[in-house]
Amino acid sequence: MVSVNDLKTGLTVKTSDGSIWQVIEFQHVKPGKGAAFVRTKMRNLRNGAIQETTFRGGEKIERAHIERKRMQYLYPMGDTYVFMDNESYEQLELTSAQVKSALPYLLENMEVSIADYEGEILGIELPTSVVLTIVEADPGVKGDTASNVKKNATVETGHVIQVPLFIEPGEKVTVDTRTGEFMGRYNG
């Protein structure tokens, strides 16, 4: 059990209904009148839902111990995706529902972290940025020089991102996996 006064960003907790939540934001509030409380924004690790919850100061909630395993993505197989444990070389098959949020950035041989709670796979954590190759890009409109003009570009995974006008097919770009935003050309 952990006191809500000790909550930190990234901490995982289990609520009374059995849901597993990760704290995204928290704020200790001590009003001039009345008891202190903690306002939180949390993400459900099973379905991705985000919820704002308020706890009374000093309230206790159960901490969920999430084990993170380093694994390598090998290949898709029908409706499943095959991963290999880097230490034991055991293979793990995940459904498309379990890897849905990672699919736009998932490349073969990519190292990922798989979140496991008591044998239940909760999801995949990607590196914060990935290098992807542009396979198709809308043409840039000549003379359109307004600042920060973007165009659509399709990367090798089939995902469409917004890139600056000067990016052409065949170029490698760095993409933020948390926001899906273009970070820059890859220089490597």
Swiss-Prot record:
Keywords: Cytoplasm, Elongation factor, Protein biosynthesis. It is found in: Cytoplasm. Its main location: cytoplasm. CDD domains: S1_EF-P_repeat_1, S1_EF-P_repeat_2. One of its GO terms (biological process) is peptide biosynthetic process. Pathway: Protein biosynthesis; polypeptide chain elongation. It comes from the Bacteria. NCBIfam families: efp, PRK00529.1. Involved in peptide bond synthesis. Stimulates efficient translation and peptide-bond synthesis on native or reconstituted 70S ribosomes in vitro. Probably functions indirectly by altering the affinity of the ribosome for aminoacyl-tRNA, thus increasing their reactivity as acceptors for peptidyl transferase. This is Elongation factor P. The lineage of its organism: Bacteria, Bacillati, Bacillota, Bacilli, Bacillales.
